Amino acid sequence: MSEAVKNLVNNDLADVMFNRHSVRQFDPNVKIGRDELQKMIAEAATAPSACNLQSWHFVVVDTPEAKAKFKQAVMKFNYPQVDSASAIVFIAGDTQSHYVYRDVWNKVYEDGNITKERLDQILGTFLPLYENATPDFLKFDATIDCSVVGMQLLLVARAHGYDANAFSGIDFEKMIPTLGLDPKRYVPVMGIAIGKAAQEPLHTTRYDAKTQTDFLA
């Protein structure tokens, strides 16, 4: 049993996934320690990413002072969850993640997970793609990575016995500077509020997946 599994309160995938609901009002008396928040982030970061670039960056907002600053770039209808959540984990996309691309894949090689031939193939194929990519490509690519890790963090929070809600009701121009990050490097993606629900969450329905699915002929 891995150390990550030992951290989980709920290891029932069906319950974690299908009984997950968005919570917007949390018990303000519940505090999640930073060690546990860091564990949850590490567990979420096992999510897949394009070319294993892991183009995400997490900013944890968990003090009254940090929340006051954070709210300067948040739409007012999201204030209740920001104020009541134990923590908000904001996920920003890193458009310069490829700068350490060689380091990432050299580590994979050094760990014995790929051959030298495969390493050379990866670096020769994918690194030039990112080095010559347009800014829009890098933003879209990082946003996809962040969306995947964000969904995983929602599930990890549930597995730790907490509730969560993903939100993007923010000022996209102000958020990155508000977080103290470089706007030339990072793009805002989403915030995830984590805590214990103070009330029964709204149970929503889903469209019939058949109406949203096509099979290419």
Swiss-Prot record:
Co-factor requirement: FMN
Catalysed reactions, as listed in the record: 10-oxo-(11E)-octadecenoate + NADH + H(+) = 10-oxooctadecanoate + NAD(+)
Entry EC number(s): 1.3.1.-
Keywords tagged on the record: Detoxification, Flavoprotein, FMN, NAD, Nucleotide-binding, Oxidoreductase
CDD domains, per the entry: MhqN-like
Binding locations of FMN: R20, S22, R24, N78, Q81, N165, S168, G169, R206
Enzyme class: oxidoreductase
InterPro entries from the UniProt entry: Nitroreductase (IPR029479), Nitroreductase-like (IPR000415)
Transmembrane intervals: none
Pathway this chain belongs to: Lipid metabolism; fatty acid metabolism
Family from the record: Belongs to the nitroreductase family.
Protein's name according to its UniProt entry: CLA biosynthesis enone reductase
Source organism: Lactiplantibacillus plantarum
Highest classification ranks of the organism: Bacteria, Bacillati, Bacillota, Bacilli, Lactobacillales
